[in-house]
A protein has these predicted regions:
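Ribosome large-subunit tunnel/peptidyl-transferase-proximal elements
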Residues: 1-53, 57-67, 108-115
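Mid-chain, well-packed structural core segment of small domains
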Residues: 58-90
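C-terminal structural segments of small proteins and small subunits
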Residues: 79-110
Length: 115
């Protein structure tokens, strides 16, 4: 699978499990550390932890192994590093605070529901 296909799989898994405001950002042209970000908002710490496990399991089934995970949810943000793919799960408050979409605003976003 390509990095984009992994990003799509992660986004679809998050969508199936009721994450909110899911987006995929293609950062390959501006980044030397990854090709795609997947961003999603969660409604609770419990959901954040559950989604972390579910997405990791789904990607591992396809051969993509996590390299690192940052945060434990208490900060309102968990970052899952798969190398070319970075998945960010936020509480609504943390997502508004860090404004990742604004930082990478000139990058292409991908609609995972249409692909």
């Amino acid at each position: 699978m390509t990095s984009k296909e992994y990003a799509m799989l992660a986004a679809k898994t998050l969508d199936e499990k009721k994450a909110l405001d899911i987006s995929i950002i293609d950062i390959a042209e501006r980044s030397g550390f990854a090709d795609f970000f997947v961003l999603a908002t969660v409604s609770s710490l419990r959901q954040m932890i559950s989604l972390t496990d579910m997405v990791d399991e789904k990607l591992a089934e396809q051969g993509l192994i996590i390299k690192n995970i940052e945060g434990k949810g208490e900060s309102g943000w968990i970052l899952m590093d798969y190398g070319d793919l970075i998945i960010n799960l936020f509480t609504e408050e943390a997502r508004n605070k860090y404004q990742i979409e604004k930082i990478w605003g000139d990058c292409e976003t991908i609609d995972f529901k249409e692909e």
